[in-house]
């Protein structure tokens, strides 16, 4: 979790954005929980949202670090197209308020076939970072 938070913080600061952070704190989905950190900030130019998302995606939770090297390794070695494995989901308010989340677990339906994309790890094995 700390890798992702540090990465997002660095990317935002490199873009001149100084966010307010809260977390980490537990977020629950049924019986499952994970650590979550929220970033709040204002974009002076809403037209920058697309380029900001491009800068942030994929996060280390999806791709690894260093980003370019890890991304190239995945493309060269994974053996399938991730397509909708991850991305951003959320609300784009016409009045300017936006809530976006990194989405890691997705489903894709094509030609009567369902593909589920999921990732995870055991925190006890890898540690809590």
Enumerate the language-model features and the residues they cover.
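Contiguous alpha-helical scaffold segments within structured protein domains
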Residues: 1-75
């Amino acid at each position: 979790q700390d890798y992702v938070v540090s990465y997002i913080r660095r990317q935002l600061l490199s873009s001149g954005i100084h966010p307010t952070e809260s977390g980490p704190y537990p977020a629950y989905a049924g019986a499952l929980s994970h650590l979550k950190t929220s970033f709040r900030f204002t974009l002076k130019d809403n037209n920058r949202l697309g380029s900001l998302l491009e800068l942030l995606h994929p996060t280390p939770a999806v791709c690894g670090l260093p980003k370019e090297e890890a991304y190239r390794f995945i493309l060269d070695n994974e053996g399938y197209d991730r397509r909708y494995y991850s991305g951003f989901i959320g609300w784009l308010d016409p009045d300017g308020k936006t809530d976006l989340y990194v989405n890691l677990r997705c489903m894709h339906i094509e030609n009567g076939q369902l593909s589920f994309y999921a990732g995870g790890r055991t925190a006890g094995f890898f540690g809590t970072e």
